[in-house]
Amino acid sequence: MKRGKKYLESLKLYDKTQQYSSDEAIDIVLKTAKANFDETIDLAVRLGVDPRHADQQVRGTVVLPHGTGKSVKVLVFAKGEKAKEAEAAGADYVGAEELVAKIQNENWFDYDVVVATPDMMGVVGRLGKILGPKGLMPNPKSGTVTFDLEKAIKEIKAGKIEYRVDKAGIIHVPIGKKSFGKEKLLENFRAVMDAIIKSKPAAAKGQYIKSVVLSSTMGPGVKVNPLKIF
C-alpha cells in the first residue's frame, strides 16, 4: 500500500518499535495527525483471550468523560408513552413496525445506535440478520434494551460507547477528536482502559492486555506500554 508524504513524515517523529507511556503516546499521536480535517483518535487493544469461547468474550459500555466528538443519531423502537418519553429525551427517530419495514425495504441506516423497550424485541428480532452484522442490534448487556429510555438516550448522546472484542482478539474504539487536546484524550483513553481491564473474564489466562496502540485516522500507530497506562 502506497503511503502519503504526510504519513511518511510522521514516522520520523518517533520510534515505531518503542512502547511509550500513555501521556507520551497521545503527544506523539497529536503531532502525527497532519490531515486537513479533525481526525478521530482511535484505540486498538489486543487481549489475551480466545473469543471463540463464550466465557472469554469481552464486551461492555463506558461513558467517555468528554464524549466522542461526533453527534450520535439514536433510533428507538417504542410505543405509546414510551415513544413520547424517547422523543422528549432527544431520540432522532422513534417508531415501531413501520421502522422495521423501512429498514427491511429501504436498507436504511441513518443512525448510529438502536435502543428498544423489552416489549418491542419480538418486533425488532426480525431485523437480527440486518442489524446484527453491523453491531446495531439492541442488547440488554449494553443497556440498549430497557424501559428507562430517558437514561439510555441521554447517556448515549453524552458519549457512551460500546466495546467488544473481535474475532482476532482486538477491541477497536474511538476516544475522541484531535481538537480535544491532550488532557481530554488522556482522560477518555484511561476511562476506556479502566473499563476493559475491569471486564477481564475469569477464564482468561496469562497476560490479559497484550498490546495497546493509539492512532489518528490518517496517522501511524503508536504503541503504549501496558504498564504505563495510568
Curated annotation (Swiss-Prot):
- GO CC term (a single one): large ribosomal subunit
Q: Which family does it belong to?
A: Belongs to the universal ribosomal protein uL1 family.
Superkingdom in the source lineage: Bacteria
Q: Does the keyword Ribosomal protein apply?
A: yes
Which InterPro entries does this entry report, sorted A to Z?
A: Ribosom_uL1_bac-type, Ribosomal_uL1, Ribosomal_uL1-like, Ribosomal_uL1/biogenesis, Ribosomal_uL1_3-a/b-sand, Ribosomal_uL1_CS
User: Is the keyword Mitochondrion in the record?
Assistant: no
**PROSITE patterns tied to this protein:** RIBOSOMAL_L1 (PS01199)
Please describe the quaternary structure of this protein.
Part of the 50S ribosomal subunit.
Identify one Pfam family in the record: Ribosomal_L1
Q: Which CDD domains match?
A: Ribosomal_L1
**Name by which UniProt lists this protein:** Large ribosomal subunit protein uL1
In alphabetical order, the GO MF annotations are: rRNA binding; structural constituent of ribosome; tRNA binding
